[in-house]
């Protein structure tokens, strides 16, 4: 029903702001399309609160990489400056290619006064960036050796850290109109002493296009689907996600196989694949015969190792 003072069904903002935070209430309001009535929706506010918390946590995590001492204390942040030329790995370049696309689409939407459409575009990629990209590159960003003891090169480590920095810096700017308080907080972490995010320039595509150097954003999509299948193997077996995979074969369309192969090291480490990792290209006819969409990744065969021993409770 439409809010009416005479009907006594007016909701004042004090209560939801105190319960969910001002950013969450602003998110709900911003999600409404221009010219249409907005339904009072607590569910939307909860989503906004979750988005703000995720931005805080993701930024805190990324900024801590490389700054922890042996006691896991995080040192003071150096001045945040990320050079797009340092993004050299295929997966990192794909993430930057998608970011360039998102910046362009969000900018065009806002210039057309479609603020809810801009939010939708930004938010969709933000979750992909956190759930897929960060999970895929965090081991490399930390410089963690793989299951065979191979340590990533300094160049590969720097590539991941630079892409993380460029990405989260962009998201702080992109989400500032929607989550003013959370973005101001993360901006102060990344750019201490440089003023407010609300005085910072809106992102432009140039640095992300430079970092992408012609990469396709689809590489990140395929890599995310591959690691999702590796997790599915473990969830269906009801074992810990830390359980090693001794061998696995994944199938996908030929372009998917090519993309997955380009990010195979990151995918294997994220999924804890310690042995043979085969990729099988499927033709459109095969996918159609099996009723599998051409855009999907499937598990053809897998073998799990022993789950890690549980730590005793003290």
Predicted stretch roles:
Residues 1-12, 17-18, 41-314:
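Feature 926 captures the class I aminoacyl-tRNA synthetase adenylation module centered on the KMSKS loop
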Residues 27-28:
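Non-catalytic, structured segments within soluble enzyme domains
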Residues 21:
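Short helix- or helix-capping micro-motifs
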